[in-house]
Regions:
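Hydrophobic alpha-helical transmembrane segments of integral membrane proteins
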Residues: 96-129
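Cytosolic juxtamembrane helix and N-cap/initiation of the first transmembrane helix
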Residues: 1-39
Length: 171
């Protein structure tokens, strides 16, 4: 058992560093997307850089381009928050005596709630950008599934924390 926990701690220590770097890259991507969007709105000219960044050619009209930009900002923000939060969970696991803590459970609930709310936002934005219904529903169900799985993992982590506390009090 000791070898398993020490291996987990070591992997989580390195993974948390990778997650921190990835989270920063995603956060910078959010800032770049917002900046390109603001510049495009101020100048009234949607730049080719923004269009290639969000994956559109510019023929769709302002409403769709704004919605596509918002969709990209949302997706990058979700990714950034997820990666940073999972990095915090891994950092906690690398430092604590048990991976099962209330704080880690709360972090997993946070991710679950973000994905739950985002599933509806992405569905709405998908229809605004005139994505095919099957694509929008697939994205909706995918993010909803992630939300449910993360919530179940949070409940398991919380239950593990309770069992760990009872075990510690028994000894």
């Amino acid at each position: 058992m000791k070898h398993g926990l020490s291996r987990l701690k070591k992997i989580c220590r390195y993974a948390s560093n990778v997650m921190t770097i990835a989270g920063m890259i995603l956060a910078i991507s959010v800032i770049v997307t917002i900046g390109l969007g603001i510049i495009s709105l101020i100048t009234g000219n949607v730049s080719d850089i923004l269009l290639s960044w969000i994956g559109h050619n510019g023929d769709e009209g302002t409403k769709i381009i704004v919605a596509a930009t918002m969709e990209n900002i949302l997706i990058l923000s979700i990714g950034s928050i997820t990666v940073i939060t999972i990095g915090n969970v891994m950092d906690s696991i690398s430092k604590e005596n048990s991976p099962f803590t209330e704080l880690n459970a709360d972090r997993l609930v946070l991710i679950s709630m973000i994905y739950f709310v985002s599933s509806f936002l992405l569905l709405t934005l998908g229809f605004i950008v005139e994505r095919r219904a099957t694509e929008s529903v697939f994205i909706f169900l995918g993010t909803l599934l992630v939300s449910v799985v993360m919530y179940c993992l949070a409940l398991m982590c919380r239950y593990g924390a309770i069992l760990q506390k009872e075990s510690d009090e028994t000894l």
